[in-house]
Amino acid sequence: MDELVLLKELIAIGLAGVFYSKDVFDTERYERIQVIAKQLIAQRSNLTREQLDLGFDGEYGYQTPKVDTRAVVWRGGKILLVQEADGRWALPGGWMDVTETLTSNALKELWEEAGVVGQAKRLIMIQDRNLHNPGHSPLTILKCFIECDYQSQNFQANVETLAAEFFAPDDLPELFEAKSSYQQIALCHEAYQAGERWQVLID
């Protein structure tokens, strides 16, 4: 098993231990386990201790994966992408809020980032972010791609996105691949072409 996966498991054990332990000395030991694991991850990846602390900030108790939803919208054979602050592009989406469902979160992010009103249609795939996107995340993230029907658009530049445009799948701009990779866009296109024949992909 990959060392980084084992170290992430140690952090999860440490967080659960702090949450459930009733002994102050055991709590200190579990906190120390987290510190050591984060130091080892920082040595073995491109992540700093500060980034690791931020990634796990607010985490406690038994650890479960984070959920990231991505809205997939087609219009005239072109796919909707939003431009991030650094100039790269991605499918509109983000963390799933605890008050949302998969589809409602995808539609919320679609409106907030692209100014698009849509209707959730179907699930295309669920992927483990660390298996399909470059760069290692200290968190386990499940990326859920939801195909949505386009209804209307009223985009305005905001703190998250600079632009929202439709692109031909064979003429894509530079992607923010940690969020949406070229392979993921290609799979979304395959699903679009397959229509009802498409079978949901799940890791």
List the model feature ranges, each with a label:
Residues 24-27, 31-70:
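Acidic, metal-coordinating catalytic segment for phosphate/diphosphate chemistry
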Residues 53-90, 118, 122:
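N-terminal strand-loop-strand
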Residues 74-112:
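Conserved Nudix-box catalytic region and its N-terminal flanking loop in Nudix hydrolases
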